[in-house]
Structure formats: C-alpha cells, structure tokens
C-alpha cells in the first residue's frame, strides 16, 4: 500500500514514482521522501511570482535540512531520515543550491548550464544512489551523468510550459549568438531560431548518457536511481517535441524491462 506521500509523488512526478517501484522495499519510502523534497524545491520556483519569494521558500527548506523542525508532510519524514542517516544533508543542500541558481536564471555559457544540470538533476540521482547504498565514486559519477541527461530531456519537453512561466533557462551566450534575449526566448519558445539550439542541447544530453555508459554500472539494488535515464534516452533519441505526448505504454515498458533486468 502506498503512503500518502507516495500518492502525492505519483500525481506530481510519475516518472520518478515508477522508478521507485524497482528499489528494495525497505528503501522505497526513502526515495519517495527524497523525490517529494525535490518536487517541493521545484514548486518554490514555479509558484512564486517573484525571485525573492522563491528564494525565501528555498531558505525555508534549507532550514529544514539544517535541522529545524517544521510541521509539513515532507519536512517531518525528511528530518527523520536525515537524523538516522538514510539521507545525506550535504546532498540535499546541494540540491537547494542548484535551485537557487535556477531562480537566478543566468547561465552565461553552455558549460555553466551543464554544470547546473549536473548539480541539480544529476545531484538528485546521486542522492538517490547514496540512499540505495552506493558508495563507489565511479558509479555515483555515472548516476550524476544519467540524472543530468534526464534533466536536459525534461527541460526540452517542458519548454512551452517554461515559456508560459516567463522562463528560458538556456545558455545566454548561445541565445546572444541567435540575436535573442532570454525574455524573447521565453515569449516564443517555438521561434525557429531556437530549433538548432534545442537540438544542440539534446546532443549534450546524449553526451551525458554516452559518458555514463563507460563508467561502472550501478548494482541491481540501486538500479532505481538510474532508471530515469531510460526515459532520457527515449526522449533524446530525437529532440523532444514542442508538445510532447504524455508518457505512454512504451515508456513504462522500457522502464519496467530495465528495472527487472537490473541494467540501463
């Protein structure tokens, strides 16, 4: 039976919810809590009308991770898992820092953009791996790369939604080369000038996956942390559509097969 937090995760982050099902039963709730925490960090940027308000919400979560008890459906189990070592405070603080950089929204170069994804979506995959017992640096690096690839795919899939929110989290030097500002890119994510940029960013995501493949594979017990890469690989095979379809049976079967086989 799912916990209430698990039901919430299924509604708000169905991709990662599916991957949780392939974690050892004793550690599933830890992943559910970690991913629910990540969703709360994402909401801080999405629901706040001003950057200052988003930063205030992120500061609230920083205080939770640093040990301040607050009544909240995610904060309460999160604190318990930090206290008993199931989750690592350093990993969670790094995720908050990545979200703070997202609020700032300035990625001056492609390298800075990639570093942000490696810290954010990649850092979440590392935190999941550690929660599942991974300690090998090579395996953790592979998880970081796979998580970053999933982050690339997610941004490209969501670019219309991001535009409606007034956001264009793309490398500003590449936008400038197109004679575009971030504001213009947010106003019209379908502008033909952006097509080559998005294709290039998708190639960066595929590069993350290629680099991960030469690193040690995660053990079967930690395969759940790597499974978002299955979806990233499918999404990035071709540049994600401007209006992507909801996840279908093929996506779910691909994740299920990889989870049952224990390899990505």
Question: Where do the PLM segments sit?
Answer:
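Catalytic cores of Mg2+-dependent Asp-rich isoprenoid enzymes
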Residues: 1-80, 92-99, 117-126, 136-156, ...
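Structured, non-catalytic alpha/beta "coupling" segments that mediate domain-domain communication
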Residues: 85-87, 220
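Alpha-helical transmembrane segments of multipass membrane proteins
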Residues: 127-131
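Acidic/His metal-coordination segments adjacent to aromatic residues that form catalytic metal sites
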Residues: 100-112
């Amino acid at each position: 039976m799912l916990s209430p937090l698990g039901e919430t995760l299924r509604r708000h982050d169905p991709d990662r919810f599916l991957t949780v099902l392939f974690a050892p039963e004793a550690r599933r709730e830890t992943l559910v809590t970690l991913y629910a925490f990540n969703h709360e960090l994402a909401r801080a940027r999405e629901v706040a009308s001003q950057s200052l308000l988003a930063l205030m919400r992120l500061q609230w979560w920083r205080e939770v991770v640093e040990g301040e008890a607050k009544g909240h459906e995610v904060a309460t189990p999160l604190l318990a898992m930090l206290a008993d070592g199931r989750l690592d405070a350093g990993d969670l603080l790094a995720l908050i820092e990545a979200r703070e950089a997202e609020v700032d929204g300035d990625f001056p170069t492609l390298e800075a953009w990639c570093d942000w994804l490696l810290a954010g979506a990649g850092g979440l995959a590392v935190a999941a791996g550690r929660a599942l017992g991974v300690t090998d640096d090579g395996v953790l690096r592979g998880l970081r790369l796979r998580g970053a690839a999933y982050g690339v795919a997610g941004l490209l899939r969501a670019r219309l939604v991001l535009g409606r929110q007034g956001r264009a989290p793309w490398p500003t030097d590449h936008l400038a080369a197109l004679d575009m500002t971030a504001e213009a890119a947010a106003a019209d994510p379908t502008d033909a000038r952006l097509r080559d940029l998005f294709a290039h960013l998708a190639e960066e995501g595929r590069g993350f996956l290629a680099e991960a493949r030469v690193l040690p594979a995660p053990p079967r017990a930690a395969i759940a942390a790597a499974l978002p890469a299955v979806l990233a690989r499918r999404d990035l095979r071709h540049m994600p559509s401007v209006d992507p379809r909801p996840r279908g049976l093929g996506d779910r079967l691909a994740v299920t097969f990889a989870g049952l086989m224990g390899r990505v």
